[in-house]
Regions:
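Conserved Walker A/P-loop ATP-binding site and its immediately adjacent core
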Residues: 95-98, 102-144
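Phenylalanine-focused residue identity feature
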Residues: 7, 47, 76, 115-116, ...
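Walker A/P-loop
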Residues: 82-102
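Conserved pre-motif I regulatory segment
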Residues: 22-88
Length: 144
């Protein structure tokens, strides 16, 4: 019996990580993404590009389709529901890149993003991910 299924992104013009999703989560994930896509008029990528102040090309260069979906869900939850989100992706799907996108979103939206980790070695990874999503005119400073 197959335990996972191919992830279907709402963003069709971005690179994909060829992710799979546990079969028991597929229906709920598809439903959530469909509702989001409908709420955003079918342009999830455009929504994220707008919120991150990036062109479509810059966005597609920095984030994969799965990551764009994750960032869209997070931003939408903040803006429309006043809620947070937990990124529960497996290793290698880009939780750090999504977190960096949310740091960028926070800085551009007047929030003070704070990154916590239990492993100091992850700060280098987060710095690299933030550099991949640069925020013009904002100096990334780090305290350890």
């Amino acid at each position: 019996m197959k335990k996972s299924t191919k992830y279907e992104s709402t963003v069709k013009d971005a690179k994909t990580l060829e992710s799979v999703i546990p079969k028991q989560l597929a229906e709920y994930t598809t439903r959530a993404l469909s509702k989001l896509n409908e709420a955003l008029g079918g342009d999830v990528g455009g929504y994220v590009a707008n919120r991150l102040h990036m062109s479509h090309e810059e966005l597609r260069e920095a984030l994969a389709a799965e990551q764009i979906d994750g960032v869209a869900l997070a931003v939408y939850n903040i803006e429309k529901r006043g809620q947070s989100v937990v990124i529960g992706d497996q290793t290698g799907i880009g939780k750090g890149r999504q977190a960096a996108a949310m740091i960028r979103y926070g800085l551009l939206s007047g929030y003070l993003p704070i990154f916590f980790t239990d492993r100091y070695t992850l700060f280098c990874d987060m710095y690299r991910d933030c550099k991949a999503l640069p925020v013009g005119g904002i100096n990334l400073s780090w305290s350890i």
